[in-house]
Structure formats: structure tokens, C-alpha cells
Amino acid sequence: AAGDVDGDGKPDLVAGRNWYRGGDWAPRPLRSIADWNGYVESNGDYLLDVNGDGRLDVIAGSFTPTEIHWYENPGEQGLRLGKHWKQHLLVDTKNSRNEGQLLQDIDGDGRPEWIVNSWIKNVPTVIWRLTDKPKSAKPGKKPDTSQAIYEMQPHQLGEKGNGHGLAVGDISGDGLTDVLVGQGWYEQPKENAWGQPWKFHADWDLHASVPMIVTDLDQDGDGDLIFGKGHDYGLLW
């Protein structure tokens, strides 16, 4: 993930165990991560101010652990001293077969949603919405920055239809963002998107990359799909 972690106006990078300051790009510690069968247990790092203190924190998911954690930016002094970022639980999804995640604004309200992809084909696809947590701080009292200002609320797009591969983009041409997975795509309803299942179109059967990309490659006015082969070679559209 890319963003201004240290507040110096330059973009920095976050990747797994380390963050890299824009300019010298030297690795600096962020968190400890276990290995799983040769994989680093991290497959989705994203930057967001989770506690409302004005600094970018990290939200991260993984393969088999079911929890989504956020890691608290330690601020100027903590970053300078190379302190690990404090880990906090954001939500336990109860899902342990996660291929990858995206943090993307799906409904256009300016706040991103958390989308989880599974390598299992016939399991639900779930979007987790970040909603405002009720404020607990009393007037005049300094907010507790160890607490997230968001809660995560699940919305199941469909009971079946997932599989290796994940993207977001407008496939139907209605101006709304749809969700693409390895077995097809979910069409965002024109109204009440979070109050109903989304229509699933089983238009393909891919073992594809995370992410895939939706863009109009041939300039014919509709969204095309660029994808890599998951755990294989090749880039196709």
C-alpha cells in the first residue's frame, strides 16, 4: 500500500513486516508476521486512518487466520525509534480460506469497503462495510486512539459464487461498481445495495489473480477484464 505514513508530504510504502520511507526506501519495522507453508501470513495491507487521529494506520488480512487487524501508527517519535505498530482487532470474520482482500469504495460514499476473496468456488462472497462506531468519549475528554472509530458490518452478496480472483469495476455499464470473482461477477443493485443480495452472473470460470483489473482496453465503451493466472504464468484480457 502507498500513502504518507510519516506526514512529511511524500508517499511511503507498506508491505507486510515493514514500511519504507519515501526517499531512502530503507525497510523500517511495522509488525511481526508468521509464515504458513512458505507463505507470509499477510495477503492484503491497506492504509486508512482507523482511529481518527489524522495518521494513516494499516488494515491487514491473511490466508487462514480469520481476524482482520489494524495496526496503530505510533506517530513521529515511534516511527523514528522503529517501534512496532500496536495490533488491534477490527473484526473476526470466521472465514479461514481467504485468497486476498481489497479495500475499495464500492457504493461511492467516499468510505471504502473491505472485500474478501476465497480460493473456494462455492462459498459466499462477503463485503464488510465500515460504519461509524458510537462515540464513547465524554465532551472535553481526549479520545482513546487505541479504539477504532469504525465498526465492520457484513453484507453477503450471494450464497455461492467466489473463487480465485478479485476485482471491482463497472461491468454492467450503469455507472455502479460491480464485484468480480473467479466464477463470475456480482451486479450492484441500482437501489438499496446493502439491503438485498446482488445478482450473480456466472460468465466465466477462472483461476485468476488478486487483483484483476477492469478497464476499457479496446475503447468500445464497456469494461474489459485484465487478469493473471493464479499461481501460473500469463496475463490475459
Pin down the residues of each PLM region.
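Beta-propeller-forming repeat regions
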Residues: 1-237
